[in-house]
């Protein structure tokens, strides 16, 4: 997997590392952005309870409200990933 570059986060290190591991596995198994997002969302819902939101893409803007400690925005290669819980 390409290097992870965190742009913004208020997530604890342990959960953040878990998000990176889930994303790595999803990106290894899928090439479509919506499929990568779906895998990450389902896994986060399963591990940490509902309701997680995941956006994966090369170019997008965002302005979201999230639970405290449940937000990370990062890049893996050319893909940006926004993962947060509401």
UniProtKB/Swiss-Prot annotation:
Gene3D superfamilies: Protein Inhibitor Of Neuronal Nitric Oxide Synthase. SUPFAM superfamilies: DLC (SSF54648). Keywords: Cytoplasm, Cytoskeleton, Dynein, Microtubule, Motor protein, mRNA transport, Nuclear pore complex, Nucleus, Protein transport, Translocation, Transport. One of its GO terms (molecular function) is dynein intermediate chain binding. Pfam families: Dynein_light. GO terms for biological process: establishment of mitotic spindle localization; mRNA transport; nuclear migration along microtubule; nuclear pore complex assembly; protein transport. It is found in: Cytoplasm, Cytoskeleton; Nucleus, Nuclear pore complex. Acts as one of several non-catalytic accessory components of the cytoplasmic dynein complex that are thought to be involved in linking dynein to cargos and to adapter proteins that regulate dynein function. Cytoplasmic dynein 1 acts as a motor for the intracellular retrograde motility of vesicles and organelles along microtubules. May play a role in changing or maintaining the spatial distribution of cytoskeletal structures. Also a component of the nuclear pore complex. PANTHER family: DYNEIN LIGHT CHAIN. Homodimer. Cytoplasmic dynein consists of two catalytic heavy chains (HCs) and a number of non-catalytic subunits which present intermediate chains (ICs), light intermediate chains (LICs) and light chains (LCs). Component of the nuclear pore complex (NPC). NPC constitutes the exclusive means of nucleocytoplasmic transport. NPCs allow the passive diffusion of ions and small molecules and the active, nuclear transport receptor-mediated bidirectional transport of macromolecules such as proteins, RNAs, ribonucleoparticles (RNPs), and ribosomal subunits across the nuclear envelope. Belongs to the dynein light chain family. This is Dynein light chain 1, cytoplasmic. The lineage of its organism: Eukaryota, Fungi, Dikarya, Ascomycota, Saccharomycotina.
